[in-house]
Amino acid sequence: MTSKPSRSRARELATKVFSALLNILYPRRCPSCRAITKDDSFCPACWVRLLFIENPCCFVCGEPLDTRYGGDLLCAACLKGRYNFDRLLSVFIYNKTIARAIYRFKFKRQAFLSKFFLKFLLKKLEPIKSKVDLIIPIPIHRKRLKWRGYNQTLLLARDISRETSIGCIPDLLLKNRHTVAQTTLRFRKRKSNLRSAFEINPNYLEPIRGKNIMIVDDIFTTGSTVNECAKILKKNGVGRVFILTIARTLLNKKYRTPNSL
């Protein structure tokens, strides 16, 4: 009779063999340059090009600041009250390295990259985690959803919800009309492009009253999209609105980054 330890070792060996075969047939690849990697991460060449956002940065929009002073600092835009949201947290400064990874996640149907970005987003979320009552994605119109295959921000929102046990409402915000892609427009056009494009799902008007909501998005560029969403949420009784994104562009073009590759 085969002993239990022998069976256990056999299963362990079979698992290792199966895993090795998978790595040969489907090797792990860097999400940016597609080089083969040893684990689910960026390759060494891409890793050194990533620009993580660290303090000091604006307390509201997360813009990196050229200052040695600590504390809750505000950038020029936030001193003027540009945004409707209360705080934005982004993991990376947007550059070519992170752009390639987000592009594959967003447009190349590589939905599995949601799990890859998740570990970075969870760490960034820590400072506000206890204050968040609900998580929602940026909605996309059904035409774009059909073309893209999925809403990448919904994948992220659900994964974060699962890991944190914070509730997620996928359809709290609705995209009621198809709009031109924001990336093709200048700043002022972006604002007008989104005017009246979003609405609150009437089924959730009471449950969200007074709640603090976190919107999950992939990239913060001018802030037009999340700003419009935050305005609608607050207009309908939401408490505070937080934003969590994978990356953000720099509004201060004079800010010196370690590299710009």
What are these language model-derived features?
Residues 1-217, 221-261:
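Glycine-rich phosphate/pyrophosphate-handling loop used in enzymes and phosphotransfer proteins
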